[in-house]
């Protein structure tokens, strides 16, 4: 175990340092690691990969693998840093196999779940990823997990089964599921959960909603009430009403509804209703950063959503501190201290 951890630390350090000269993709199959370099490194590593392989990508923008049809894990350096030189960037991709896990990647456009040639895909995970456009599916996908992601539009509800989204920021949902395939959504920020624009509501998928910030976003304040429909269930959520002014030249383009009346049906408990500016300094941010984010047992910020927390870093070891003595000791040795952390 220690040997594997050390190899990963060395690998990750090399991958970040090599970025100055080029892009790196490292393919791990069993105990064998193979590096690939350049803008096509990801494609070359993927072509050489077999089911069960792990591909680790450095920071930088790689050429895409348009369809991922092998049961593999793909891990990037990060998806969230403002400086693109620190992100792992892909244009888009389609997930077309079971048991695919993707983590720490910034997709500029769309991630698609499933293809017309497959009856379904199962057990796929997106973790700590940011998507520029949408998470889309018009195909059956089962046991999909989205965790600690930032996604403008989720268009993957209709044919989902056991779809779980947690610790994530979503702008809005588009497309509807049914009472037979309700989702599970927890510890998320949904900016336009109830979105009333141009006399039209956005889709409001059926789900069990727990511990979320759910935004009520409208282009005017003519509708100050909303009814939560079954079979959805709502527990310990905070509803955050806000709407955009029509005067887009205003230096502060957001105004806030003083109240929204929520009509709670059965299956609802311990929900609250506050104005959006009481919980967020900046609306519509991806990912969201609520005020007074909860703390963990050691006093560190758990994440903007609570729950299991939110981290910008993927689950590969990274060096968080290092100390190297400038002089050797009496035995002629130099003390080196390295602290390594890996997210869960």
Region spans (language model):
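Sec-dependent N-terminal signal peptides
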Residues: 4-14
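Sec/Tat signal peptide C-region and signal peptidase I cleavage site
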Residues: 16-20
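Acidic Gly/Asp/Thr-rich repetitive segments characteristic of extracellular carbohydrate-active
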Residues: 25-63
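Acidic glycine-/aspartate-rich tracts in secreted/extracellular proteins
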Residues: 60-61, 78-81, 239-246, 293-300
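Right-handed parallel beta-helix/beta-spiral solenoid domain characteristic of secreted/periplasmic
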Residues: 71-115, 128
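Predominantly extracellular beta-rich ligand-binding scaffolds that present long acidic/polar faces
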Residues: 102, 108-118, 126, 131-281
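C-terminal accessory segments
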Residues: 256-314
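Short, compositionally biased P/S/T/A/G/V-rich stretches that sit at domain boundaries
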Residues: 300-334, 341-343
